[in-house]
Amino acid sequence: YCWFIIACNLWSISILICPMNNLSQKKILLTICGGISAYKSLELIRLLKKQDAEVKTILTKNAKEFVTPLSVASLSQGKVYDDLFNAENEAEMDHISLSRWADVILVVPATANTISKLSAGSSDDLASTVILASDKDVFLMPAMNVRMWEHPSTKQNLNKLKSYGYEIVGPEIGDMA
């Protein structure tokens, strides 16, 4: 089954579409984590929207240190989700509705912290809870310092996530910022 391949590496963003497939009407949940390369997620949103994909976004607490909810909302043309507990509508469980809505989940940049949390099955924020509650394809685009990338814990966590069926895309070598 040929979905589509998204190559959003640490230092370059491009979308490669399978020859017989396109992103029109695809529901993509973009989870933006707190790393210096988070700003590149803005370009990814723009590219996905240009391909007529439906994009919803989750910002982790740390992601908001690098990109603003306003810029993400402007590009995605929708609400930015950032809290596990929805004060506006307590009856709505965003982690369930978002996990059901998405055709695919992208984690950009997938930080060492996020990779560790997902590997451990932690669900202490909206992003990790949505992913844990989902049965959809999950693509992780790791972005971190080379020493963090090469650390045995990171390698072990990535191997565990691969065994769960998560797709790891990248990283490449280059500048993060």
Regions found by a protein language model. Give the residues of each.
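A cross-family phosphate/adenosyl-ligand binding-site feature
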Residues: I15-F139, N145-A177
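Feature targets compositionally biased, intrinsically disordered low-complexity regions
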Residues: Y1-C2, I17
